Amino acid sequence: GYTDTDFPALFLARKAMVCYTVQRNKHKGGTIRMKCTIIGITGGTGSGKSTFTNRLKKAFPDDVTVIYHDNYYRCQDDIPFEERKKVNYDHPDSLETDLLVEHLKKLKAGESIECPVYDYSQHNRSHETIHVEPKRIILVEGILLLTDPRVRELLDIKIYVDADADERILRRITRDVKERGRDLDNIVDQYLTTVKPMHYLYVEPMRNRADIVVNSGMNDVAFDVVRAKIRDLLEED
């Protein structure tokens, strides 16, 4: 993997693989060819993945769409709520990655998708979906994103966001309580029993599969370089 200091050389030497998607031109009734680049953003819980992803989305609001791997947690309608709380959500099997792969392929082909929505407070998939249209840049974010070789194959650029372990757990507690309405005791218990051990088993090893390693989601140098790369890709038409 590459670190922050490798960015200039990396982006001068390496061009992201680009696929061409064909979309229906609603205004002219024809089709247009559109370059599509998929960028994967991964890293441990609370590392700053979402911060980094949101900064990129904000920089290119009209050209970037975001897919969150978390929304692909399996539907658990047949499991009682108390039992859902005990599920190991930090294991790859907890995610319906087959559906994610299918959706990424559709987006690359210029097709829209109906993305599932996950309800963290209920530990279950919502019955609602989000309509997602393909765009020039597709950001895919998730803790376990790189564990599946099919996903890695679809990603043109792979970014791993790193952060100190203590900093990550503090961020997770704050986020899950304030943003996801979860119980503090449950958060701490989950971290000790599944999040921490699964991080070292599945997440951290993926650091070596990343093209770029970013130290913190608020790393301005890394953000500026990735933003410049995206700008270059958008100007290639």
What function would you assign to each model-found segment?
Residues 49:
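Conserved lysine of the Walker
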Residues 10-33:
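Short, Lys/Arg-enriched N-terminal segments with co-localized hydrophobic residues
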Residues 133-134, 174, 196-237:
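NTP-dependent small-molecule kinase module
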Residues 79-120:
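Conserved nucleotide-sensing/catalytic segment adjacent to the nucleotide-binding pocket
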Residues 44:
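P-loop (Walker A) phosphate-binding loop of NTP-binding proteins
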Residues 52:
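Hydrophobic positions on the alpha1 helix immediately C-terminal to the Walker A/P-loop
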Residues 126-179:
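ATP-dependent NMP and nucleoside kinases share a basic, alpha-helical "lid"
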Residues 62-77:
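Short beta-strand-centered segment that lines the nucleotide-binding/catalytic pocket of NTP-utilizing
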